[in-house]
Amino acid sequence: MNYYTAPMEGLTDRIWRQAHQRWFGAPGAPARYYAPFISPPENRVLIKKKMAELDPAANPGAPAIPQLLAKDGALAAWMIGELRKMGYTEVNLNFGCPSGTVTAKGKGAGMLRDLSKLEVFLDEVFSQAEGPISVKTRLGVTSPEEFEAILDLYDRYPICELTIHPRVMRQLYRGEADRAAFAKYLPHCKMPVCYNGDITTPAQLKALEAEFPNLSGIMVGRGIIADPALLRQAVGGAPASKEELRGYLDELYHGYTEAFGMASCAVSRMKAHWHYLIQRFEGSEAFEKQLRKAREGWEYEVVVNQLFTLPLL
């Protein structure tokens, strides 16, 4: 079974990928890091600063896989070609992002609203681009039943791997992932399938693996931010120690400070990580408000020092 990390905007950037690989990476865990989506520029002029996220030199260790967010198939095919020039083999297409700012533009899971347009997009991509192309998708916009027609469309193309997040667009991340719908449609998938959604513990991951042994992979998202050692434990490694977590978080903080040029900007990014990670510390409720209110680097550092006096759960 392959284990992957999900693309999450504002969380799984190159700084995180480097720190995670250094502190918690294990052979095959993860096998791939999927990078947060990029949108191809309409003028077809790449911005060096934005592309730095995908500089192969900045992504050592486990392979990083770029993800595209686009609704113009010809433009997406051009961008895939540019990524191939950078040395990337697989490129992932995003039909799963449920964010309102994304779907309002007809991108991400918004592509699932009109299957005729999605078909045109896929025709253009697969006729013009070369090499492996994978897809990350939701089940539909409002109902899981929509996936029957969506899958019928996907099955017509040489998708190298289909990652299914079994929620619909309107759910965002509310409610539970629909395992029953996933199980219903899995036998009808003609391509390798990866599961994504609501995997937060090694036990849950192993139970899913036992339930669906023919999956090509399992992708973890919020669970790997809440427990950076999740995949390491899945392959028999140790849980995260307090010392490892401290080193990992300090590396993230200093990396963001250097990248953004200001500690206050790094604090904002670190809060996104702590939103999931804070639950690992017993009694952390007493410090949640202080962490939310922290703006400057010194304020953040004071709260983090206090959090690390608490035992891990």
Protein language model regions, located:
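Flavin-dependent oxidoreductase catalytic cores
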Residues: 1-313
